[in-house]
Amino acid sequence: MAGWFELSKSSDNQFRFVLKAGNGETILTSELYTSKTSAEKGIASVRSNSPQEERYEKKTASNGKFYFNLKAANHQIIGSSQMYATAQSRETGIASVKANGTSQTVKDNT
């Protein structure tokens, strides 16, 4: 099953999206947006940037866990991954975002 985006609205009227893999696991979480239109533009940015290896910033958190940020051409963070125990599992996460990030399916939960 192919992945999809889920768009949601927070209790303080901000918007965020997540990218889900085909198994339902969240593989990328966006920043908060002040408008639904901005969040939808963020989804479009994931679609265009996710296939490009150079858009992934690989990081190590202070607790030693591994994660990545997906960045746009202007170097703004579009979304961040979960924390991974190993660098290899982070690479698997990146591969999943590459495989699912071009999805045209958006589940609007706003």
Swiss-Prot record:
| Disulfide topology | none
- List, alphabetically, the InterPro entries matched: DUF1508, UPF0339_domain, YegP-like_sf
Q: Where is the signal peptide?
A: none
Among Pfam families, the record links this protein to:
DUF1508
Q: Name one GO biological process term.
A: double-strand break repair
For this UniProt record, the keywords arranged alphabetically read as follows: Repeat
The segments carrying the sequence repeats are 10-58, 61-109
Q: Which family does it belong to?
A: Belongs to the UPF0339 family. Duplicated subfamily.
What protein name is recorded for this chain? Answer: UPF0339 protein YegP
